[in-house]
């Protein structure tokens, strides 16, 4: 059994796109896809899918989010107001938290 990689972002993180057609846009992470090294971000990388008519449903053009490679997003720090790198620190109780490298703000509460 092959497990996916550990990624620097988690579900519900606020991220900013650093490259591509949606550069400088921010959004909330909806889903993590470790096997594809990708993330789904709310309102980012919108694509159109043409669906066939099925039974009583008519065909339509549906807009939805597509996967973005995890290297194209960075965590957005609300305190700094910028995209930042993170560091993992261990608290006294043994819990690991992600910390902003620039200001020291903890992302995992």
Curated annotation (Swiss-Prot):
Pfam families: KOW, ribosomal_L24. One of its GO terms (biological process) is translation. The lineage of its organism: Bacteria, Pseudomonadati, Thermodesulfobacteriota, Desulfuromonadia, Geobacterales. Gene3D superfamilies: 2.30.30.30. Part of the 50S ribosomal subunit. The keyword rRNA-binding applies. CDD domains: KOW_RPL26. One of its GO terms (cellular component) is ribonucleoprotein complex. The gene is rplX. Keywords: Ribonucleoprotein, Ribosomal protein, RNA-binding, rRNA-binding. Signal peptide: none annotated. GO terms for molecular function: rRNA binding; structural constituent of ribosome. SMART domains: KOW. InterPro entries: KOW, Rib_uL2_dom2, Ribosomal_uL24, Ribosomal_uL24_KOW, Translation_prot_SH3-like_sf. It comes from Geotalea uraniireducens (strain Rf4). One of two assembly initiator proteins, it binds directly to the 5'-end of the 23S rRNA, where it nucleates assembly of the 50S subunit. One of the proteins that surrounds the polypeptide exit tunnel on the outside of the subunit. Belongs to the universal ribosomal protein uL24 family. The keyword rRNA-binding applies. This is Large ribosomal subunit protein uL24. HAMAP family: Ribosomal_uL24_B. It comes from the Bacteria.
